[in-house]
């Protein structure tokens, strides 16, 4: 892919990438078997596993988790009222989109309680083994400490495109905006009103400037991580992209990633 030529301008070493075209064909760059911590892209996996628990009736989106009147649905969509890392809620649920690692740790604790196994084991049984993500595992917080590789994350992207582990209806709900019209901040990116988010994935919407590209449709959903990781799927073009870098997300990514993503979409849409 010619789009991969743009990566030479990135200040990131050992970059590995996978772009999946509308036919499901994967185009790769770099060592896609190399493992690293995927940072907040972990939240996509944690959320998908939680939705599996919801579908098998172990819990429900209306289950009370955390502060008073807070539900699993609130926490999955960063509407639970918890700050980035604080354990004390700062607003009531459903009032603001406050991106929260704490919320995802509460989710993992809840799934552990209802499943009666560790969350690491739950991820392995519910996600990693069924999808063949052989190099992936949880090594700490469910919010940001999953270790994986691009090959494994490409399998996750295929699941997000064509869900097999959860129903198409649940997947559609999860990848569209929940608790609409909430304003909030995407850390490292900016404040948006509304700040669109699903049950796990961020939804592109009309956010600008943004880490996604201008060619990404409003319905594009995914996540990036502070370790220089990203995964998104664009339902309009039916194109997905996954990447792991060894340079933390910063201004360089806000500049280079959208250019690269636009090039990927342009090239694979032909």
Regions found by a protein language model. Name each.
Residues 1-37, 95-96, 112-117, 121-124, ...:
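Catalytic loop of the DD-peptidase/beta-lactamase superfamily, centered on the K-T-G motif
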Residues 13, 19, 73, 89-90:
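N-terminal core-entry segment
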Residues 17, 43-46, 50, 75, ...:
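Residue-level preference for non-acidic, small/hydrophobic
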Residues 38-41, 53-89, 99, 113-145, ...:
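Active-site helix/loop module of the DD-peptidase/beta-lactamase fold
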Residues 45-47, 102-109, 151-155:
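Well-ordered alpha-helical segments within folded domains of soluble proteins
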Residues 52, 67, 77, 109, ...:
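Generic detector of well-ordered secondary structure
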């Amino acid at each position: 892919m010619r789009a991969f030529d743009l990566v030479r301008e990135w200040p990131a070493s050992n970059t590995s990438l996978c772009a999946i075209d509308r036919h499901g064909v994967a185009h790769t760059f770099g060592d896609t078997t190399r493992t690293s911590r995927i940072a907040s892209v972990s939240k996509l996996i944690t959320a998908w596993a939680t939705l599996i628990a919801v579908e098998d009736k172990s819990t429900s989106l209306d289950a009370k988790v955390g502060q008073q009147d807070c539900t699993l649905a609130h926490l999955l969509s960063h509407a639970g009222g918890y700050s980035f890392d604080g354990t004390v809620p700062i607003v009531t649920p459903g009032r603001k989109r406050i991106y929260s690692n704490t919320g995802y740790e509460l989710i993992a604790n809840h799934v552990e309680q209802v499943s009666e196994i560790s969350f690491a084991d739950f991820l392995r049984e519910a996600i990693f083994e069924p999808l063949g993500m052989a190099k992936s595992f949880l090594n700490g917080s469910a919010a940001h400490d999953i270790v994986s590789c691009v090959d494994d994350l490409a399998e996750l992207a295929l699941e997000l495109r064509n869900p097999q582990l959860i129903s198409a209806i649940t997947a559609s709900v999860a990848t569209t905006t929940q608790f609409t019209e909430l304003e909030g901040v995407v850390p490292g990116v900016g404040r948006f009103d509304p700040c669109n988010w699903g049950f796990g994935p961020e939804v592109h919407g009309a956010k600008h400037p943004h880490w996604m590209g201008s060619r990404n449709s409003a319905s594009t959903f995914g996540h990036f991580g502070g370790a220089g990781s990203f995964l998104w799927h664009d339902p309009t073009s039916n194109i997905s992209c996954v990447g792991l870098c060894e340079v933390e997300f910063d201004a360089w990514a806000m500049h280079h990633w959208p250019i690269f993503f636009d090039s990927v979409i342009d090239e694979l849409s032909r």
